Amino acid sequence: MNEAAARVLVLFGPTAVGKTAVSLEVARRLGAARCAGAARLARAEVISADSRAFFRGLDVVTDKPTHEERERVPHHLIDCVPIDGTYDAMSFRADVERLVPEIVERGRVPLIVGGGTLYLGALLRGLFEGPGSDAALRATLADRSLEEIYKELCDVDPQAAASIHPNDRLRIERALEVYRLSGRPISAWQAEAVPSPFRFVVTGLERERAEHRRAIAERVRWMIENGLVEEFERLRAAGLTPDCQAYRTIGIPEAAAYVSGNITLEELQVRIANRTWQLARRQSAWFRQEKHVRWVDVTGRDAASVARDIIELWSRTSEGER
């Protein structure tokens, strides 16, 4: 198979916008769709680009697709990293470049679904061969305030600082890490990024602000009612510590504070909802910078109707169009 000719359907959007339900409908309906009288389209296989679904055990807190849903539609890159492990954008891209040809060879459509901007960026904007991670340097940066490290980034790489949200600690730390280890700003590395060998048909989901906030509040209530605190306690016993990459997942530090008696159940719910909304806004801002996106408004709609729109976009897209 010629990898350069492989088309990949990408479905992204901020957290709690409804990506999982829509992706399952897209995968199901692709099996029955016909493209302008052409041959029957293959069913999709989902490649997760959810930056926390990679980790085994983060089930409730990430609202992963259920085992039943994963049996109906094949999923990849879910539960592929131990709870105390690490996973980066380079590993993600390598996995995607391995999986896409395999999925296409099976006669199915590769469907990348998620909101992890770091990982999606490695695919859509290209990946650069910069320096690796340095644990000691990361620990030093972690001890400094967010305001301090963002100011440093503004000084050493204003171009990168302009493209990174001031509250996005992970990306700020990575930009400073690259600069300190290589002596070059990350924006210079990014200008040399290697493009993906695939052709992407990119669809983005958006939702009216008030409805989106209600959806986030409902998800947080569901998480707490379905065992968020118990999940945290199990993971802590299994080796999850504040030093772990998975510990940064929204809901985990808050659950730790609740278990320690530092916040009430009501405060737990409010804190998670507020952090989730802040994340959704940052993700939306990042997605809006991406070119060649077909936007689909999901406000007041069910997953089936949204999926029909996405399949129509996919079907209309010519082989040579990104």
Residue ranges and their predicted role:
Residues 1-322:
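Phosphate/pyrophosphate-binding catalytic cores of soluble transferases and nucleic-acid-acting enzymes
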